[in-house]
Regions:
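N-terminal amphipathic alpha-helical segments
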Residues: 2-78, 136, 140-147
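Onset and early core of a folded interaction/catalytic domain in large eukaryotic regulators
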Residues: 233, 265-268
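Alpha-helical bundle protein-protein interaction modules that mediate dimerization/oligomerization
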Residues: 77-255
């Protein structure tokens, strides 16, 4: 569960984007888009628990798109008549909101192991958003804006890159996911895993301290409760997701009590 600054709650991998109103002015829409692009670019230096390479490519595309939006903002000024590009820009605004939510999920402290195990789902979401950027941007009526040739070329570049960008989990992610599943299988058979294997998993997702583990456990507890409520609401008797989350909580508790205690002892 994500607790926002406004006090609202959002389940991970849900994207409650708000469609800009039809009467929005072009300048207001562009200003909001430029702000959203800036927000997205702040994730460039953050630690991604999954799909790092794909996100880096997408952020580079947003960086180029931010340049385009700034140039459009300068060129169009404050038009008195309806601008035909508002529709495609509104679509991009929704895409940016969803992308920001996805970036928040994949860099969130406490959700690192959970997001790693959702790597395929993250890839699917990012693929859809990337293709949507290409579709919406290609529909933008560049003929209505007197843009420099290099900016038009940048638009074409972003469209082509987004269209060709195949999103898939990083190979390192897949290896670590396999390791997590192997460790969970060992726990089920009451066998202790190799500490080196556990350390490799923790280093990959960025869980390094006792406090990190506490955040992971708290988040997983919230997700388990939310999942149970959702299942009850939908009369869903499937416990697969709850079982996975519970197993991950057990894994993190083991890491906190056994592995990180050993790290602390050896460093003191």
């Amino acid at each position: 569960m994500i607790h926002s600054k406004t006090g609202s709650n959002r389940r991970i991998l849900t994207f409650p984007a708000v469609q800009p109103c039809k009467s929005i002015s072009l300048t207001t829409l562009l200003d909001s888009l430029i702000q959203l692009a800036g927000d997205i670019l702040t994730f460039k230096q953050k630690h991604f628990s999954t799909n790092k390479r794909s996100f880096q490519k997408t952020i580079r595309q947003i960086q180029n798109l931010a340049i385009v939006l700034e140039e459009i903002r300068i060129r169009v000024g404050s038009p008195r008549r309806y601008f035909p590009g508002v529709s495609s820009l509104s679509e991009i605004h929704v895409i940016f909101q969803k992308l920001k939510f996805l970036l928040e999920d994949c860099t969130r402290d406490g959700a690192r192991v959970c997001m790693l195990m959702s790597s395929d789902q993250v890839s699917d979401h990012l693929q859809v958003l990337t293709l949507s950027i290409s579709t919406s941007l290609s529909a933008f009526p560049v003929s209505f804006v007197d843009l420099p040739s290099e900016v038009n070329e940048l638009i074409d570049l972003v469209v082509q890159q987004a269209r060709k960008h195949v999103v898939r989990p990083d190979s390192d992610d897949k290896k670590v996911i396999d390791s997590v599943n192997q460790v969970l299988a060992l726990f089920e058979n009451r066998v202790s895993p190799e500490p080196d294997e556990i350390n490799r998993i923790l280093d990959h997702v960025g869980v390094r301290t006792w406090g990190d583990c506490v955040k992971e456990v708290n988040f997983l507890g919230e997700e388990i409760e939310a999942e149970r409520l959702e299942n009850k609401k939908n009369n869903n008797n499937s416990n697969a997701r709850v079982e996975l989350l519970s197993s991950l909580m057990g894994f993190i508790c083991y890491c906190r009590c056994v592995i990180l205690n050993k790290r602390s002892s050896s460093s003191s």
